[in-house]
């Protein structure tokens, strides 16, 4: 009989929003498309708020409320960057519902976003979801084209 006491669960990052899944290489911003911040995927949101894609701890909330960093329970660090050039909105269009240091669970609401305002006042409402410490591990990105918040696994880690 083999015991799996020490076998770690594989990381599963679920979609934080509903929308179209886009390869990171197609995000119209070189910081993301050239993977300067790490491996990942992007979602063009169709509706709704932004929810936690993993169980973990909030480690960063941008002062302009457009980005949230989460450390998953396995140590993987995930950045949700809501929109492109949204730092210039100075927090307008965003209401963050968590604080740095909060323990969060998959599916917990972390941000309300005014998609109409963001669409009119920023370059894009696309959400890059980046593993900022991806050099340490290997990840498998989904081949799905559409994301269902809380259900579609978009990134799997080893």
How would you label these PLM feature ranges?
Residues 1-158:
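Contiguous, well-folded functional domains in the mature portion of proteins
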């Amino acid at each position: 009989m083999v015991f799996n006491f020490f076998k770690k669960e594989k990381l599963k990052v679920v979609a934080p929003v509903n929308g179209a899944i886009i390869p990171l290489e197609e995000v119209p911003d070189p910081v993301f498309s050239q993977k300067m911040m790490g491996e990942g995927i992007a979602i063009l949101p169709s509706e709704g708020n932004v929810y936690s894609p993993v169980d973990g701890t909030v480690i960063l909330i941008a002062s302009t409320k457009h980005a949230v960093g989460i450390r998953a329970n396995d140590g993987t660090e995930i950045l949700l960057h809501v929109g492109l050039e949204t730092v210039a909105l100075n927090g307008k269009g965003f209401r963050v519902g968590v604080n740095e240091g909060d323990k969060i669970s998959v599916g917990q609401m972390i941000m309300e976003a005014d998609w109409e305002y963001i669409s009119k006042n920023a370059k894009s409402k696309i959400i890059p979801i980046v593993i900022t410490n991806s050099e340490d591990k290997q990840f498998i990105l989904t081949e799905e084209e559409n994301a269902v918040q809380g259900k579609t696994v978009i990134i799997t880690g080893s």
